[in-house]
Amino acid sequence: SAVVHDENERFNTVARCSLKELTLCFGLLEERHKLLVREAGLGHIGDFKIRTNINRRLMSFLMYHIDPVTMNLDLGDGTKIIQINADAIHKLFALPFGENSPPRPSDSIHDDALMRLKAELGYARNKQIETKDLRRLLANLVKDPANDALALKVFGLVLYNKFICPGYTTRVSREAAMVEDFDILKLKDFNLCQLVVDELRKAVLNWQASKSDW
């Protein structure tokens, strides 16, 4: 298990993981889009009750008390253990628990996939894409059925960026590779639950190894 340092040192005013952002984007979708999201096994996103992010002191405590090897969360004296695994994630969030491996985030925050995505979405190569940019774009795309595929791709980007595998920055970066050839209906066959566990393990390792927030 990790050595616990001073949690008060570990604050960050920016939320990388945000269910609120995801539910806001789900709310922008028209019913025709939501039907496909439901068919993909993600329709319950609109029913999430969480509208704010976790208390940052609590988040820091939890990240220090997860063993990245076993992915056990020790909440006390060694007897209050929660095992974080794909089954637990499925029960908590009801994410697709399919047999196929989902695409993974890129190792680089600046790669060709990101450049192609920026071009497809109409952004300059030097533009840093934030979730607020995606919300504005999505609000316009959903108005025209001809843009439905791109609208769902933008929603998938927010799904990965703000929920499934939030990375080291708030801007879109590593997730660009995950939405190439994006098909919303393929999500139901992916094991997104294991992806959440794997990405959380990486986050825990980075958190515990760093003296400042990543």
Please identify what each model-predicted range represents:
Residues 1-149:
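N-terminal leader regions that mediate targeting or early regulatory function
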Residues 34, 49, 87, 98-99, ...:
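Long, internal protein-protein interaction and assembly surfaces
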